[in-house]
Each structure stands twice: as structure tokens, then as C-alpha cells.
């Protein structure tokens, strides 16, 4: 009977001592210690004992979870003895772990925002385009014939008369002056190229001179549309100029931009019917 009881008690004692058997052996006490070395700090009995007790407490907690019977009281007693230090260690580990995760997530979020921010740049909103009616274009062209630059009073009057804003009137006149300048530059380029072709291009030079005179006259308060178009095949000759050999009698057409100013203004208005001009809201 005693041998059987001893045999039954032996496994119980082994189970009781099993968590403590895994503890590390004590440090060598024969080695001389210095108070400020890292090894001495780590080999202090209090520090090693605290870590060993925390390890034993974790082992006992795991054993209590998996084992239905056993020694929950001894494990709880040992865990209660070392609970402040173990709780501090767990709290510190959880705190630093949470900080690392939050820092990584914040960094990833910033990287993602910068990447998507570079790709998904908002498009610049285009300005609205004002489509003028035929009546508005006709009145603006008629006013542009004798007045290239408007005073504030004239601008207000035209805007009120045509149902436009001051900004729309200003923009239209700016674009119209720029278009007149481009037409003159294109005409000059055509004349320069005609000079290189031969004497037949001299007729266009006379037409260009008259066109420039008319544009200067309109800028000073005279008439003229300022964007007359040279018609190929019907050059304009000054009075008394010799006729080109082989050419028939040349006559100025009644709708010529150099002779009939009202007709030219009507042509200008027809050319500008479908033109849209950018105007700020």
C-alpha cells in the first residue's frame, strides 16, 4: 500500500515542481562583480528572480487554462506574488506594441495619401464661354469700326444696351484688337513672300499699303473694318498704275473692303457669328 501511494504521489510532486524546474540556475557567485557593468546588472539576483518568476507565472497561467484539474491554487498564489511586476511588463509590452502599430499605420497612410494625391490631382476648371448673338456681334463690330478703345462710360453704355456685362465687353474688344493685329501680320508675311515670287507680287504691296492706311484711319476715328481680305485674282491698283501684261480691265467690286465700309462691317459680323470668347464668370 505504501509503495502504491508513493508511486501515486510521485507524479503529483513532479507536476507541482514542473514549472519551477524550468527556471535558470543561479549566477556564479565566485566571479568578482563591478557595480556598473551590463553583465552585473543583468546577473543581479533580484532581476533574474523577477524575470524567472514572471516566466513561471506565465507557465502556470497556461497550465491552468489547459488543465481541468491540477494545482490552480498554487499557480494563483505564485501569480499573485509576482503580479505587479508581470502586470507592468505586460502593460509596457502592449503599450510599445500599440505605438509601433499606430506609427506604421500613420506612415502607410501618409505614403498612400501622397501617392494618390499625386495621381488624382483635381483638374482646373475651365472658364465659361459666352456665345454672342448675331445682333450683339453686329453692334460690337459697328462700334469697333470707329472706336478701337472704349472709355468707361462707353463701355457701360454698350453693356447696358446689348445686355452684356462690362467684363464681356472688355474681353470682346481685347480679342478683336488682337485678331486685327494678327491679320495685319499675316498680310505682311504674305506680301514678303510675294516679293520673293516676282513682279506679280508688287500689286499686293499697294493693297497692303492702302489696308494699313485704312487701319490707321480707323484707329484715329475713321471707318473701316480693319480685317479686309485680299481676293486672289483681283488685285487693287492705284490710279494711273500700268496694267499687267495679259490682264484684263480691273475694277473695284462694290463690296470691296477698301471702298465700301458698311458692307465690310457686315462681312465682319458674318465672320464673327460662330466665334466664342472666353469670359470670366
From Swiss-Prot:
Localization, per the record, is:
Nucleus
A Gene Ontology molecular function term for this protein is:
DNA-binding transcription factor activity, RNA polymerase II-specific
CC annotations in GO: chromatin; nucleus; transcription regulator complex
Q: Which residues bind DNA?
A: 125-184
Q: Where is the composition biased (Polar residues)?
A: 253-267
Spell out the Basic and acidic residues composition-biased ranges.
1-20
Q: Which disease is it linked to?
A: Central hypoventilation syndrome, congenital, 3: A form of congenital central hypoventilation syndrome, a rare disorder characterized by abnormal control of respiration in the absence of neuromuscular, lung or cardiac disease, or an identifiable brainstem lesion. CCHS3 is an autosomal recessive, neonatal form characterized by slow and shallow breathing due to a deficiency in autonomic control of respiration. Affected individuals present with respiratory insufficiency and absence of the hypercapnic reflex that stimulates breathing.
Question: Could you give the subunit structure recorded for this chain?
Answer: Interacts with SKOR1 which acts as a transcriptional corepressor.
Q: Which protein are we looking at?
A: Transcription factor LBX1
Organismal lineage: Eukaryota, Metazoa, Chordata, Craniata, Vertebrata
Q: Which gene encodes it?
A: LBX1
